[in-house]
Amino acid sequence: MRLGRDFYNRDTLTVAKELLGKVLVRNINGVTLKGKIVETEAYIGAIDKASHAYGGKRTNRTETLYADPGTVYVYIIYGMYHCLNLISEEKDVAGGVLIRGIEPLEGIEEMSKLRYRKNYEELSSYEKKNFSNGPSKLCMALGIDKGENGINTISSEEIYVEDDSSIKEDFSIVEAKRIGIDYAEEARDFLWRFYIKDNKFVSKK
């Protein structure tokens, strides 16, 4: 079942935790790709010095952060790598959840071609280990770039998230510091990164 607006229109920390175990769906090149979300990070606009919208900042780059809950926010890091976020809370609040890691479930051959331009069976153990265990890695595997920025996952067939009862499992959630935000003063110590314990597609344990 596809996640609706009510799922995203809640506290960002709650959304970030409850996205774990859900399935990210991407339709591209006539193929359906699916991955279980195993790692997320929460960012809460006005109060979070690690957020692009800290202090209510609004620019052309960050405007999507203020969009309807369930909207896709894609930004670029290091001038070349993309990161996928899902907007949470009410419109104009600027809450968002960064998807940091997925466990491939369906369409792995297509993901491999998008990620490495090779068939999956040709990948080295190192390449398989680093398939989708990081925000930019999963964007490459799913063919996500700035062209997907602003997509509404509530109605789009290109990208959405579903709750698939057939893959439900019990798991423990680890709460940890977010990664790569040492500039964010006290916010760098917030335990706003969440991941499924012992899952091999988590970027950093």
Swiss-Prot record:
The name this protein goes by in its record: Putative 3-methyladenine DNA glycosylase
SUPFAM superfamilies, alphabetized: FMT C-terminal domain-like (SSF50486)
Record-stated family: Belongs to the DNA glycosylase MPG family.
Sample GO molecular function, one term: DNA binding
Alphabetical UniProt keywords: DNA damage, DNA repair, Hydrolase
InterPro entries: Formyl_transferase-like_C_sf, MPG, MPG_sf
EC number: 3.2.2.-
GO biological process, one term: base-excision repair
Pfam family of the protein (one): Pur_DNA_glyco
The organism of origin for this protein: Clostridium perfringens (strain SM101 / Type A)
